[in-house]
Each structure stands twice: as structure tokens, then as C-alpha cells.
Amino acid sequence: MKPPIIIINFKAYENSFGDKAVNLGKKIEKISKEYSVEIILSTPATMIYRMSQEVDLPIYAEHVDPVPLGAFTGAILPEMVKDAGAKGTLINHSERRLRADEIDDVLKRTKKLGLKSILCVDRYELVYPFSLLKPDAILIEPPELIGTGVSVSKAKPEVITRAVDEIRKSEGIYLIAGAGITTGEDVYKALKLGAHGIGVASAVMKAKEPEKVVEDFITSALRAISS
């Protein structure tokens, strides 16, 4: 994981699984290699193995459950996604919230397994406290902006700048900005405000030409870090 970080969360859209997901992943892989910018794909658990076999990009889980090995029907464990080929996982996404003690447990297990961790928080006040648990990155997403097309970098730039101030108190942890990021200009502003990368979902997954959206994000990110 290195800046500029771009993570695309596939969620559970029509094109999030099966051949459609693989084809999208291959298109993103091609653009990623063209610009030498690594893109992380966070996919449904049922797609981790196939995506990791057919797409040459880091595949992350969208969520893992904070339960041990044992009698937990339907649970998706860190050990399972690791075995399926995942390189990391999202933790505590706004659509899959965990308690603080559960986050601590999951982070300990992902570290032990060698999985990268992207911990999601919904406000900047949580950045420093959760940075003490040493995730690889913290993704800040005001939930009211998720999926709206109104980006955090435009609507609430102070959320990013304050989160940047908080992340600087801990060494070696990246800050990723998410929620409503739709255009290349949103990406550019987020990185210029101090974020190390961006997290997106619907802007790519619901786009008519997702590869063009991804290319716009990459070129905007590169422009931000080089200017």
C-alpha cells in the first residue's frame, strides 16, 4: 500500500459479482498498470478467490466478522478471506459497524495473518484514538455523504484537514478520504488537503464507463502529488 491510494469498494451492485465483476476488475487492472498506480479492489467475500486468481490487483474483503473459529453459521472470518486470497480487508465500514473492542480484536487477528487493514471512521475525532490500534490506513467517511455524489472534499474539507492533523500524531498510518467522491477534481482536492488516497464505490460501480472514471481519478491523484 503506497500513495496515491485508490480503493474501489464493489459492495453488492449488479456488477459486483460473477463475470461482470471480473471484467471490470481486468479493465481497472489495465489502467492501473498503464499509470503504475496500484488500485485496491474490495469485493464481496464470494468473489475474493476468483478475483485474486484472475485480476492482478490487491483484493480486499469488504468486511470480516469479529468472531473466533467455531460454531458461527454464516460468519466471514479473517482466516477465511486470507485463505481465499485476500491481501487485506475493510474494517468498521459505516454499513458494517463494529464495537471498539471488536475492532481491536479484528486488527490483532489481521496483523497476525499478514492482512492489511483499512479501518473506517465517520468523524475526525476518532482518527487518533483508533490510530493507536495501528491499522495500516484509516478511511474517513462522513456517512451522510456516502453515495450522494457530494464529496467530502467539497462539502466538508475541514473533516479531511482535521483528520490529517490527527493522523500525524501517529507514524506510519495512511489517511484515506471517502464519501461522495465522484470526479477527478474531488480526488485532487482530497489529496491536496493532505489525504494519502481516496475510497470510492458508486462513482465507479454505477458508471456507464467505469474505466474512464478510474482513469480520471488516477490522473487527478498523480497531478495532486506532483504539484
UniProtKB/Swiss-Prot annotation:
GO MF assignments: triose-phosphate isomerase activity
NCBIfam families, per the entry: PRK04302.1, tim
Tree of life domain: Archaea
Described function: Involved in the gluconeogenesis. Catalyzes stereospecifically the conversion of dihydroxyacetone phosphate (DHAP) to D-glyceraldehyde-3-phosphate (G3P).
Residue positions of the active site: H93, E141
Protein name from the UniProt record: Triosephosphate isomerase
One GO term of the biological process aspect: glycolytic process
InterPro entries linked to this entry: Aldolase_TIM, TIM_sf, Triosephosphate_isomerase, Triosephosphate_isomerase_arc
Assembly behavior: Homotetramer; dimer of dimers.
EC number(s) from the headed UniProt entry: 5.3.1.1
Biological source species: Saccharolobus solfataricus (strain ATCC 35092 / DSM 1617 / JCM 11322 / P2)
